[in-house]
Amino acid sequence: KNEKMFSSRIQYYNGKIYTDLYTYEGADSKFLLSEVNMKDGKRTSFWLDAVQYNKGWNELFIANQQPFISQYEGKPRFSQLFMDTIFAITKDDIQPYIVLQSKNFVTKDYLDSQKETKKASKIFSNLNNTTKIYNICNYLESDRYVYFNYYIRDNLYITFYDKLQKSAYMTQNVVNDLLYVDDEGVQLFPNFISFDEKRAYSVEMNNDFSRNVFLKDIQDNRINRKVKGIDSFQGISEDSNPVIIYYEFKN
């Protein structure tokens, strides 16, 4: 046990358990990722120094912050709030998988300039008054496309990278006409948790906010009747477990 560090999420892969890692003020080192011994729960390995890879930031700010996303089979991916690199966890080590470059990424110099601001909420308020990019999340990949989200001014942006054409497309507006009826115009904002070459999995009702929204969508008949298993939604209540939905990629 180390009272100067804690974890929020775990990831199992290839017989090992990994956790994200956050540290309190006064910690001797600030790593972002650790491996945990499955027998005694002690941390055995540490990776990704926060200063080098996350602009020095090593606090948990967003309660539902999800640094891991796992392929159904294969290497889990890992990225933190201010990282410009998505890492792959392999059976042997941790490897950079995708590096993103933009002059608009939040910089270490900018975060250092906020050190006198003691409250993280104020730091993010200041950040959202800029046009800086942060929080790469919801990463997934098919045979042809790479998809991920990022934020500017607390607004969600969507990026598609076409491996065949070697080109990227950015937008804020992708309508989720798969889950919702066509005329609703509901924006695509899934919480992806896993993917493979043919489909992606998202989770709904995994917190109070998404639970209330999803239950109201069902009540208001906003869910597309073409969704397989939609009849089972009628028995869902606020006491139900989270709902996992999968989206199939088109060829």
Q: Where do the language-model regions lie?
A:
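Asp-box/WD-like beta-propeller blade repeats and closely related beta-sheet repeat scaffolds
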Residues: K1-K30, R43-N58
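Structural signature of eukaryotic scaffold interfaces centered on beta-propeller domains
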Residues: F6-G15, Y22-Y24, N58-Q80, S125-D143, ...
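Residue position within the beta-strands of beta-propeller blades
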Residues: T19-L21, F78, F148, S202
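Structural motif
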Residues: E25-E35, F82-I89, I152-Y161, D208-R222, ...
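Loop-centered beta-sheet repeat module
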Residues: V36-Q95
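Conserved blade-ending motifs and adjacent loop-strand segments that build the rim/top face
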Residues: Y53-G56, P96-T130, K163-E197, F209-R211, ...
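Predominantly five- to eight-bladed beta-propeller fold
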Residues: P96-E116, D217-N251
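C-terminal structural cap/anchor segments
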Residues: N135-G185
